[in-house]
């Protein structure tokens, strides 16, 4: 016969078992969701390069250069999040459009920046404020006339970027 004490233990085991099964299924669902979102972003990136930047898409060195930014900043965001001490706000995402803009078009710089920020927003737990702030700063970088050869204009652009961070945060 089953006593009340034994029944409570069995009920507790059942609840724990169901909780573990649910957590495994939900974590698997989340992983599948991230894989789908990442695949969609990468597909959009490849389609954009093929249609709007065919010179970059067809030359392996340029394609590797552009793709390396995605991989590097995604990995950097992952490392910062895993550390638990640092925040993803400390990662200088605005460097990407500055460098890409120096070598390629403004449109390509903005698109790569958007893809990097979206990847980072998948990795980090900071929410939409992080994504909004980084996209806003990327727009300021694209719109500001950053000329790395003219130091005064360069520092004015850096001041605009800093003010955007300060006001939006």
Predicted features by range, described:
Residues 50-64, 68-169:
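Generic detector of multi-pass transmembrane helix bundles and their immediately adjacent loops
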Residues 1-55, 61-73:
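Conserved catalytic-loop aspartate of Hanks-type protein kinases
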